[in-house]
Amino acid sequence: MTTSSNRQSSDALYQDALTHIVGGVNSPSRSFKAVGGGAPVYMERGEGAYFYDVDGNRYIDYLAAYGPIITGHAHPHIHEALMNASSKGLLYGTPHRLEVEFAKKLKQAIPSMDKVRFTNSGTEAVMTTVRVARAYTGRELVVKFSGCYHGHSDLMLIAAGSGPATLGSPDSAGVTKATAKEVITVPFNDVEAYREMMKEWGDQVACVLVEPIVGNFGIVEPKPGFLQAVNDITHEHGALVIYDEVITAFRFTYGSAQQVYGIEPDMTALGKIIGGGLPIGAYGGKAEIMETVAPLGPAYQAGTMAGNPASMATGIACLEVLEQPGVYEKLDALGAKLEAGIREAAEKHDVTITLNRLKGALTVYFTDEIVTDYEGAEKSDGEKFGRFFKLMLENGVNLAPSKYEAWFLTTEHTEQDIEETIEAVNRSFAQL
């Protein structure tokens, strides 16, 4: 097992970064604030299932860039596609062949999308679906589930209040109270709370945003019947169902969580995996709804870099890798092996955990309670997770620096990687 106690170059880079970059990082999630502080690890390169930092340490990577790198780092097929595209020009500002090819490929994989439009990020995709839903329905209120993250647009940075349903309050400075009043939050997996909320507000609701499988307070599956009930109740009140599949699309099957549960939304927002590692977003839905978007309709959305050739090329290449036989079966088998090893280690070292896994993604919560909603995830011991995170790093395993994030497997992880990871878990649990 590789250990990585020497990180002097990372420490020095962090001190330099603090002078030039806000907080030393370009996204708060990269900070180690949630795991006890200190300098984050600065990576030099990624290769397959591994990261190599600026001090030469190797890590088995389960961050996978918070999910997008399902094919591992620097996958040869995706790299080749990027090189070919870049040799012809990275940005056109005009229509081109690759955006048509990629749109067709996404539609084939996710049949609920009659029409598709590309954006630059998942945040943009979600933000635009809400705008389109409001334009289509003529209504203003938006519903989301407590603890579910839908990007950093003002409307989505709303925290859950107390009680079964509440008008939101701002979760970030700079988000106005007026904006917060446009969002209603409801506990995930609670059909009755959703039903009661819609009885009160349904005639004003434009849409509900749903992570069909939660990925932002760990991996949490919907309870049986929950997604169908949300669809039925929403449509009874004339509102639209939007699936935020930025994390879930192509993570658990070739396609989306819609195929896993057999339920179709009105619109779908995509990101992360579909770019093969490059910035991307997309949204799609029923033709009559999507025709609300300019230039056909009054809902405006645009982007200089939307549909750029590089992202289209890597996106197509990524899906070509994922559609090969056996990909998701391998991810599931490795996930099962990792889960069994973590559970055995927890029992051996008398460490209390709850583990949620779906195929190639899992979350370890330091709590004895079953986690089916955000309230349950909050009970995970953050201080203990912080110590576990740093111990795993010392033992050559890279995780997300937050108790709420998932471990993501890639097509490049091997059984040997899983065995090394289980060894690291045992060493770390022994020191908690």
Swiss-Prot record:
Q: Which GO terms describe its biological process?
A: protoporphyrinogen IX biosynthetic process
Q: In which pathway does it act?
A: Porphyrin-containing compound metabolism; protoporphyrin-IX biosynthesis; 5-aminolevulinate from L-glutamyl-tRNA(Glu): step 2/2
Q: What class of enzyme is it?
A: isomerase
Catalysed transformations (reactions): (S)-4-amino-5-oxopentanoate = 5-aminolevulinate
Q: Which UniProt keywords apply?
A: Cytoplasm, Isomerase, Porphyrin biosynthesis, Pyridoxal phosphate
Main location, first listed in the record: cytoplasm
Localization per record: Cytoplasm
The GO cellular component terms are: cytoplasm
Required co-factors: pyridoxal 5'-phosphate
Q: Which GO terms describe its molecular function?
A: glutamate-1-semialdehyde 2,1-aminomutase activity; pyridoxal phosphate binding; transaminase activity
* EC number from the UniProt entry: 5.4.3.8
Q: Which residues carry this modification: N6-(pyridoxal phosphate)lysine?
A: K272
Q: Which domain of life is it from?
A: Bacteria
Its quaternary structure? Homodimer.
Q: Which family does it belong to?
A: Belongs to the class-III pyridoxal-phosphate-dependent aminotransferase family. HemL subfamily.
Name of the protein:
Glutamate-1-semialdehyde 2,1-aminomutase 1
What is the primary gene name for this protein? hemL1
